Amino acid sequence: AGMGTSIHLAAALLAAQAGVDLLHVPYKGSTPAAADLIAGRLSMMVDSITAQQSFIKSGRVRALGVTSLQPAPSLPGIPPLAQAADQPNFEVLTWFGLFVPSRTSPDIVKVLNTAMNEALKTPEVQKALADIGASAQGGTSQALGVLWDNEIDRWGQLIVHHRLNTNEL
């Protein structure tokens, strides 16, 4: 994927923890990168399960591991990279949050948060997410804020320590 994306940073983290050099080749999305991987123009790529699941299941792409600490239910038999690459602390999870303008009233935030949490619990949403290799975890807006701050710290340290910048990414 492109420069500075979560996919790029996941590969940079894996390279840093494994002590190997990887060349980042920026793409405008997963599809052209996957096409080059399938055609043999790339030797490897890091991407999301949702983007690559159909290629993996069809046998066109071989998954070596998942970036979660637990196996992904949608890809049985594919180990976590923490285990497969002998990197016990390697974990990268893609997450999405519901965001509103900062001036939004707390009452509206509460209504939206409650509705989102209820929707995420429904069997239909759970199944739809599982079908594409994803899962849902609701929570509070405060918990999302903590996650946000932790992710900024985590990835900021990687970017600063390895001197990653958009001119080099």
UniProtKB/Swiss-Prot annotation:
Transmembrane regions: none
Signal peptide: none
The entry's keywords: Periplasm, Plasmid
Main localization, broad class: periplasm
Matching Pfam families: TctC
Gene3D superfamilies assigned to the protein according to its UniProt record, in alphabetical order: Periplasmic binding protein-like II
Domain of life of the organism encoding this protein: Bacteria
SUPFAM superfamilies named among the record's database cross-references: Periplasmic binding protein-like II
Subcellular location: Periplasm
InterPro entries xref list: BUG (IPR005064)
Entry GO CC: periplasmic space
Protein family: Belongs to the UPF0065 (bug) family.
Protein name: UPF0065 protein in clcB-clcD intergenic region
